[in-house]
Amino acid sequence: MSGAIPFIGAFESTYQPAFDVDVLETTAHHLHWRTDLALLQTAGVSECRYPIRWHRIERDPGRFDWGRTDDVLGHLRDEGVTPIVDLVHHTSYPAWLEGFTDPRFGPALLRYVEAFAERYPWVEAYTLFNEPFTTFLLCGLEGIWPPHLQGLEGFVAVARNVLPALTGASRRCRELLPDARHYYVEVCEHATGESAAGLEYAAYANDRRFFVTDAFLGRELDRDRPFVADVVAAGGAELLELEPGHIDVLGVDYYAHNQWHWRAPGDGTTASPDPVPFAQVMREYWERYELPLIVGETNIRGACSDRATWLKYTLEQCERARAAGLPVEGYCWFPFIDSCDWDSILCRSEASVDPVGVYWLDEELLRRPSSMSDAYSLAAGGAPASALPAYELQPPVSRWLEGWLPQMEHWDWQPPPPDEVLAAIDDDYEIELKVVTRGV
């Protein structure tokens, strides 16, 4: 493949069932979507991962209100922006469903997907379900999101109800939208270890990361694989015999906190002090699935200049992967504007701005430019990573990314813009956010 890697826009939209609010609302994108999309186009972007808000469209079972969706998708179509529609983003299901173990979920998902496809037959690209593996972990294994199950039995309970629904919806989409491409978007992880126990658990984590995608594709799963054996023991044998779903493009979502270093089970560090290059992690996914790739998501939480530096790193890695023969078809910084409330992993709803966007949000939620938006526009316009600035990292990002610095040593570094230098902050802030429950 040759030429610049196309950029893909995106907007965070996760619905918080406990608060009946989504991130499009807390960031005011639902009010300013025309302005936000105009900023995206001005940057030179003509593709966008765009959320379809099932939780607002089907407030009552079987009754669909497509009015707002008609407006936005019609606008994108008129403006020549190709939407990669995001049909379910994490817990973005209607409030009348009682989470991912509700037996109504599968039929409801199929009904919704059919209704969408019949209304918008011109859509060229879609994601059925954003990051299923991560969602199953947060909802079923760790108990952070509803239905708040814990342990491998909880993970299996969620997967048993959702994965067959997804494979069925995938097959139905191929019938209704035969010319559209399914962008299957999943977290992109890599684990390393030290000591015998740490190395053993890293191998377990590196096996676990592929399980959901393998099962979705109906691959023959070796019951001797450590995680597969645990899934079977937890009651998930039927997940090994799913009728396959279909993937056209694999979106790999890469964050620094996706690289863990384990000393023993339950004793790990992220971001890893010894991370492998992102291009190498992409190759692991390419060699396993042999599908066209996009970076489905990436960002770093920090100063605007730090985000610009992470953009340079991840884009450079994509260029290296492509030069080595990997079919990297797109790059998505996620999201285009700052998000909200991820400082509690959406366990609170306080409109707490999360500094991760191309454009940052001020106290009045106005969209503000910065060194990041400048660098993004350069890259989206076709500039290679070598033409992007490398800003000296600020705390806490400078601590998080210490392990990545050897991969960046060939850069010419410069100080961050004076107006983007952060005031003194608590450098103990961790990259992997801790859950903060209400009232604590």
Where are these regions (language model features)?
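Catalytic domains of carbohydrate-active enzymes, especially glycoside hydrolases
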Residues: 31-53, 243-245, 249
